[in-house]
From Swiss-Prot:
Alphabetized UniProt keyword annotations: Amino-acid biosynthesis, Aminotransferase, Cytoplasm, Pyridoxal phosphate, Transferase
Organism this protein belongs to: Oryctolagus cuniculus
Protein name: Aspartate aminotransferase, cytoplasmic
Chief place where the protein resides: cytoplasm
Single Gene Ontology BP annotation: glycerol biosynthetic process
CC annotations in GO: cytoplasm
Coiled-coil blocks: none
Subunit architecture: Homodimer.
Cofactor(s) annotated in UniProt: pyridoxal 5'-phosphate
Reaction(s) catalysed by this chain's protein: L-aspartate + 2-oxoglutarate = oxaloacetate + L-glutamate; L-cysteine + 2-oxoglutarate = 2-oxo-3-sulfanylpropanoate + L-glutamate; (2S)-2-aminobutanoate + 2-oxoglutarate = 2-oxobutanoate + L-glutamate; 3-sulfino-L-alanine + 2-oxoglutarate = 3-sulfinopyruvate + L-glutamate
Entry annotated with the keyword Heme: no
Length: 31
């Protein structure tokens, strides 16, 4: 089984990626 440290890092990385994607999408001018 993977250590708790890595297991805790996974759920934290997901929200960060989603937030970055949404931020880039908002910054991008809509056609």
């Amino acid at each position: 089984m993977a250590p708790p440290s890595i297991f805790a890092e996974v759920p934290q990385a997901q929200p960060v990626l989603v937030f970055k994607l949404t931020a880039d999408f908002r910054e991008d001018p809509d056609p």
